[in-house]
A protein has these predicted regions:
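Active-site helix of classical SDR
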Residues: 141, 151, 155-158
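Conserved Rossmann-fold NAD(P)-dependent oxidoreductase catalytic core, especially the SDR/UDP-sugar
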Residues: 97-143
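Alpha-helical substrate-binding/gating segment
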Residues: 178-187, 198-219, 226, 241
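NAD(P)H-binding glycine-rich loop region in Rossmannoid oxidoreductase-like domains
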Residues: 47-48, 52-90
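Conserved C-terminal active-site "lid" loop/helix of NAD(P)H-dependent oxidoreductases
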Residues: 219-221, 226-244, 260-261
C-alpha cells in the first residue's frame, strides 16, 4: 500500500509488536494519547509522523485520517476489569469515531483489534481445561456469536458490530482480529489457557501486515500463533488474509522453556 497506514494506540503492546516487526514495510502515521520516545518509533518515522491525540476526539481523528489508505485501530482501555464508563467512552465511542472518520476520509480498510474476551464465556466449566489441550477438537472459528465474559469483552463485541455496520452501510473493508495472549520470546508461563491462545510478536506483526495488504469485505479472524494446542481456528485468517504463522507454543514447556531440539 502506497498511502500511509494510521496506527492508533501505537505505544501499546500490540502496536509496538507491529512496529518492531513490520515498521520498515509501510509508511506510518502513529496516534497515541502519550508522546512516543525515539526508541518506540520504527526507522524512518519521526515526531512529525506522531499525533498525540485521543480517538474520542472527532476533529483530531478527522485530521489524522487525511490521505490514509488503511487503519489499524488498537487504541482503547485494555483492562479486562475496566469499568463500564471507561469502555463506553474509550472502546465503544472511540471505535465509532474511528470508523466514522475513516469513512468520511475515504479510507479503504480498517483492521480492528478485537479480543479473546469477546468470546471468553464459551470457556465454560464443562469445557475447561480440556479445550486448552491437544486432544480436544473444540474450535471457535469466528462465525459464532460473541459471548463476552466481562465488560471489556462487551466493548470489543460492540466494536465488531460497528465494523459490520460500516461495512454494510458504507462499503468499508473491515477485519476484526480477536487477539489471543501476546507475549515476546516465549508463551505465557505456567498458564495453560494462555499457551493455547499464544500470539508471538512476529506472528502478530505478520498478521497485521496481511490485514493491510489483503483484500476482504468483512471478516472476524483469530489472532493466535499456529499452536498445536488451541481452541481458536486460524483457518479463516490463512484463507482470507494469507496469514502464515511461524510459532507454536508446543515448542515450549508449560514453564515457557524451549523444548530440546527447538
Amino acid at each position: 500500500m502506497d498511502d500511509p497506514v494510521l496506527l492508533t494506540g501505537a505505544g501499546g503492546r500490540v502496536g509496538q509488536a507491529i512496529l518492531h516487526g513490520i515498521g520498515e514495510g509501510h509508511e506510518w502515521r502513529l496516534l497515541d494519547r502519550e508522546p512516543l520516545s525515539a526508541d518506540r518509533l520504527p526507522p524512518g518515522v519521526t515526531d512529525d509522523d506522531v499525533i498525540v491525540e485521543d480517538v474520542t476526539d472527532t476533529t483530531a481523528m478527522t485530521e489524522a485520517m487525511d490521505g490514509v489508505g488503511a487503519v489499524i485501530h488498537l487504541a482503547g482501555d485494555p483492562r479486562p476489569e475496566a469499568p463500564w464508563n471507561s469502555v463506553l467512552e474509550n472502546n465503544i465511542d472511540g471505535t465509532q469515531t474511528v470508523f466514522e472518520a475513516a469513512v468520511d476520509a475515504g479510507v479503504e480498510k480498517v483492521a480492528f483489534a478485537s479480543s479473546n474476551h469477546a468470546v471468553s464465556a464459551y470457556e465454560t466449566d464443562t469445557r475447561t481445561p480440556d479445550m486448552y489441550r491437544t486432544d480436544d477438537d473444540y474450535r471457535l472459528d469466528g462465525t459464532e456469536l460473541p459471548r463476552p465474559g466481562n465488560l471489556y469483552g462487551v466493548s470489543k463485541a460492540a466494536g465488531e458490530t460497528l465494523g459490520r455496520y460500516y461495512h454494510d452501510s458504507e462499503g468499508l473493508s473491515v477485519v476484526c482480529v480477536r487477539i489471543g495472549n501476546l507475549t515476546a520470546d516465549h508463551p505465557p508461563r505456567n498458564y495453560e489457557r494462555g499457551q493455547a491462545m499464544w500470539l508471538s510478536h512476529r506472528d502478530c506483526a505478520h498478521l497485521f501486515d496481511r490485514c493491510i495488504r489483503a483484500d476482504y469485505g468483512y471478516e472476524i479472524v483469530y489472532g493466535i500463533s499456529d499452536n498445536e494446542r488451541k481452541y481458536y481456528s486460524i483457518e479463516r485468517a490463512k484463507e482470507v488474509l494469507g496469514y502464515e504463522p511461524q510459532d507454536d507454543s508446543a515448542a515450549y514447556t508449560l514453564a515457557g522453556e524451549p523444548r530440546d531440539g527447538t
